């Protein structure tokens, strides 16, 4: 058992990106923040499934070519093998929770970003 406050961790890109509160041994759990106009490279996972829950703002998550516009309170589940691309195309930051399982040290395969 452990506890931690998100302020004890830093976002990967300074003010944005993922902020991992836990990496392994069975799952990853992160708070993710994207500023207006920011995106995250399209990719898929061979083994891990990924879930996002929106805490603040609005975001587009394209899964296998289908655009999903999500806002506060929305949840999306992404299966292994489904290509997903995250973009904040809006005028305010988005903050969301990301949970991936089962934990794999290396399981991200980058692909070309979709045009939408």
Task: Give the label of every model feature segment.
Residues 80-106:
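Ligand-binding loop in jelly-roll beta-barrel domains
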Residues 25-27, 58, 66:
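Well-ordered beta-strand scaffold positions
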Residues 30-45:
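Conserved short histidine dyad/triad with adjacent acidic residue
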Residues 47-49, 54-59:
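Glycine- and acidic-residue-biased ligand/ion/polar-headgroup-sensing regions
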Residues 25-27, 47, 91-92:
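Short strand-connecting beta-turns/loops that link adjacent beta-strands
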Residues 39-41, 60, 76, 80-86:
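Histidine-centered metal-chelating micro-motifs
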Residues 1-28, 108-116:
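A short, N-terminal "cap"/entry segment at the start of jelly-roll beta-barrel domains
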Residues 65-80:
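Short acidic-glycine-tyrosine-enriched beta hairpin
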């Amino acid at each position: 058992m452990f506890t931690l406050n998100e302020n004890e961790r830093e976002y990967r890109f300074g003010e944005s990106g993922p902020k991992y509160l836990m990496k392994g041994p069975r799952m990853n759990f992160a708070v993710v923040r994207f500023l207006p106009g920011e995106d995250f490279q399209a990719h898929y996972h061979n083994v891990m499934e990924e879930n996002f829950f929106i805490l603040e703002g609005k975001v587009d998550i394209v899964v296998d070519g289908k655009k999903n516009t999500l806002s506060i309170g929305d949840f999306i589940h992404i299966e292994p093998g489904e290509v997903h691309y995250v973009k904040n195309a809006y005028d305010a930051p988005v903050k969301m929770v990301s949970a991936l399982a089962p934990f794999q040290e290396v399981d991200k395969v980058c692909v070309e970003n979709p045009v939408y």
